[in-house]
Amino acid sequence: MMSFNIRSSAGLLLVLCAAVTNVFSQKLLTNYTATLPATDALGRKLPAFNVVGKEKSDKFVGLFYWTWHYAQAKLKPNNTTAFLQKHPDALYDYKHPAWPQNIMNFWNEPLFGYYVDTDKWVLWKHAEMLADAGVDMIMFDCTNGDMVWKPAYMALCEVFSEARKNGIRTPQIAFMMGFGASKDTKSAISQVYNDLYKPGLYKELWFQWKGKPLIMAYPDNIDPEIKNFFTFRPGQPVYNKGPERKDHWGWLEIYPQHGFVKNDDGSFEQMTVGTSQNWTKENGLNPMNAKGAFGRSYTNKNGQNTNKDAHQYGLNFQEQWDHALKQNVELVFVTGWNEWIAGRYETWQDQPNAFPDQFDTEHSRDIEPMKGGHQDNYYYQLIANIRRFKGMPAPEKASAAKTISMDGKFDEWVNVKPEFIAHKGNTIHRDADGFAGTHYTNTTGRNDMVKAKVARDNKYVYFYVETADQLTSHKDPAWMRLFIDIDRDKKTGWEGYDFVVNRKSPDQKAFLEKSTKGWNWKQVAQVDFNYTGNQLEIRIPRTFLALKNTLNFEFKWSDNMQTDGDIIDFLVNGDVAPSGRFNYPYKEH
């Protein structure tokens, strides 16, 4: 144990303040889903511990993140993909009369709607989702002029800081500035330094690199005070040249990507991975709607895959990840999460009616889930590759068999392992304006589930769940449902779940139902349940579950589901434990 010689009350205060900050530091928080299984809509399973191996403490993942939507929110949103399906002749005609005026084009609609990035409900969702993914750092786009979008990054810091207090391992933050040592870049750096860093605001969220807060910017014309405060890594704007100065980092490249900042041992600090690139073989840098642009389904190996649903698979994304995983790099920087906005110009790079950065579902580069289309496929693809890059903790083994009395006292659950932890604080309600003409409300957050366990003996399997506050009445609709994937096979049941408890509100006993196919259920039996305060337990006879001698299944809790039969509801409404498509695994050893 370390000892400290505190010489003054001021010194004691500094130590206490440092300790408080440290409590919520990313390194001391746990990624609750790091060991959990999930299967995406395409049937792709997340890699397990026996595939990716132990967690590597020297590997990091950064993600490009956009904070400037609020500045455009007075405009109505226009879905470019949907618009061009109705007006294909407007594709290269800037003055086509069908193009609406006073709008902001989106390549498609985000899952959470046309939100403004000061919407705290959305920011909390991002905090959880990126924590679950294992993202270490998000980097804000401040590459246009000297605008740094302070209201949005401060709103995010406030929400992420609150999420940390609830145990959520949110990413750290950093800024990407303009690609050059310009007056605008100098001004932007000064703004974030004076407004955020110098006063020490949200210090626990700063991403540190080589002992200092990281900033992706050019240091050439920066005042000494600021220059000495940050680790500077100037951004290389070009996609195909690699580093042109020793301290260059990339933000997006075409395949095969270069390593940036070579270390003494031959490894590299950084490499980029992108979902798509506004680039063509013929002309290099081009708008996303240029013929031959490298969309989501383009690969260097096979060119453009023109199958209708090719965008679902992230072929471009995976080719870049496969390359990065073969290299020895410290940090993979992924572009990107949530740009969404598709700027339209009369000409750009000699292209008429140009969409430089985002265009449509195929020619876009966001990973954040969308409504319809590829939904959350890219999100789970990101998680899968982060696991391959960083490894993962070994899953905790189940404790010995134990009989639970079902007496409503719950003391017998104390030493049952594993103890599955779920995000706390995520039942907040939403009431916020989006882009012009949109307003979003969501009041479905109800029972905030924070912990789950399973026990078993020769006759029964027991399930336990705990909430942050007192449970609501079991007569509430869609109350505390338990989904069980008994064979760990997504092809059976509904989204892999073969059984459900509490799809119908329980009475004296709970109803156990089996899927006949999809969201069609047939009652199997009535089973015992108890709940008191913030704890609930359910007992199911093994015979009803058609279990083999050795247990090996997955399960999930859901409260206040709104759209029966739609698994995407798990990302939007009520609360689930664990989040999204993740499940808790339970296996006898």
Locate the predicted segments by residue.
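The substrate-binding groove and active-site-proximal loops of carbohydrate-active enzymes
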Residues: A34-D40, M104-D119, V135-M147, Q172-K183, ...
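Short, well-ordered beta-strand segments enriched in hydrophobic/aromatic residues
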Residues: G408, K459-D469, Q535-R542
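Acidic/polar low-complexity flexible segments
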Residues: E396-D407, F483-D507, R542-H589
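N-terminal carbohydrate-binding/catalytic regions of secreted carbohydrate-active enzymes
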Residues: P47-E158, T335-G336, W340-I367
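Aromatic-lined glycan-binding groove of carbohydrate-active enzymes
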Residues: K54-A73, P213-N316, Q320-F333
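Aromatic-rich peripheral "rim/lid" segments of glycoside hydrolase catalytic domains that contact
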Residues: A163, E346-F410
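Loop/turn elements at helix/coil->beta-strand transitions in domains of secreted/extracellular proteins
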Residues: K56-G62, A133-I138, N166-I173, Y202-E204, ...
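N-terminal module-boundary/linker segments of secreted carbohydrate-active enzymes
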Residues: Q26-A73, E204-W206, I222-K227, T231, ...
